[in-house]
Design a protein with these regions (language model features):
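Hydrophobic alpha-helical segments and their helix-loop boundaries in membrane
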Residues: 1-277
Length: 277
């Protein structure tokens, strides 16, 4: 039995009645849409996972999503120019989804940096394996918290479902038409998501920011009443302790806020998909 016959049998078993080369081209387009989130978002791998594992995970996701593209395989062009254009389109969709899905994780890192700056602990650095970056102590804590919340909510399942929905709304062999509101609406939505990044960061950091502000105010009053007190050196001891205390007493508020913001993020994902359609 020759190789061509084996390929024909494999093609028939997959339910694909087109040339096998079209199937490979379609799968390459699918991988271009799937791999950016696998590579860039912490919960699907991020920088901590070896490239071989990320490629394997992307391949498995592609196999899971394969039934959604069976009707689109025949429409994939064999022309190199048209195929490259479709590949760029898939990369654009994948990168856009990666940006929207990763908004809460980026906001958590910014929130942690704000907390460390206000508490004076920003000189201490830790390596966060999810993003392979040196970040401050509370940035690390915030990133780990939102990652655990995301996985506990089954957010990774929702993201995979969003990929399936994207294949229905924007097939591999078709370009985005922006029929709903035009391309400017998509650009405006991405800008609003970017603005939400800082709003979420402030929301996650607000309990500690308020506590450190009150601490600074109290120390300022002490300095006015008793100038002989070395407030600067006192603050170096008090503010980190206050930050840790408030962080752990208000952690339920931070977790509730993270849950709420994930709902907002999932809404942004579906809105972006509708605008791309």
């Amino acid at each position: 039995m020759d190789a061509s016959h084996l390929l024909d049998q494999l093609r028939d078993s997959l339910g694909v009645h087109v040339d096998f080369s079209h199937l490979l081209l379609a799968f390459a387009l699918l991988m271009a849409r799937v791999l950016p989130p696998v590579i860039l978002t912490p919960f699907l791998g991020g920088e901590t996972v070896p490239n071989e594992v990320k490629l394997g995970l992307g391949f498995m996701l592609g196999m899971v999503l394969y039934p959604a593209i069976t009707s689109q395989v025949a429409g994939v062009p064999a022309s190199p120019v048209l195929f490259v254009a479709l590949m760029l389109k898939e990369l654009f969709i994948g990168l856009t989804l990666s940006f929207v899905v990763g908004i809460v994780f980026d906001a958590a890192q910014i929130a942690g940096n704000l907390v460390d700056t206000m508490s004076g602990t920003n000189q201490a650095q830790l390596m966060v394996p999810q993003i392979q970056q040196q970040v401050s102590l509370f940035s690390n804590l915030q990133i780990q918290l939102v990652t655990v919340v995301f996985l506990s909510l089954g957010g990774h399942h929702i993201v995979i479902q969003a990929f399936g929905e994207s294949l229905e709304r924007i097939p591999l062999d078709r370009y985005p038409t922006f029929a709903m509101a035009g391309s400017w609406a998509l650009f405006n939505t991405v800008l609003r998501v970017y603005g939400d990044l800082f709003r979420i960061a402030l929301a996650l950091a607000s309990p500690v920011l308020l506590a450190t502000f009150v601490t600074d105010l109290a120390l300022g009053l002490i300095n006015r009443v008793a100038p002989q007190v070395q407030v600067f050196f006192v603050a170096m001891q008090i503010k980190p302790a206050v930050t840790v205390l408030i962080m752990f007493t208000s952690i339920h508020l931070i977790l509730d806020r993270a849950v709420h913001e994930y709902g907002t993020m999932f809404g942004w994902v579906h809105q972006v998909l509708r605008l791309l359609e």
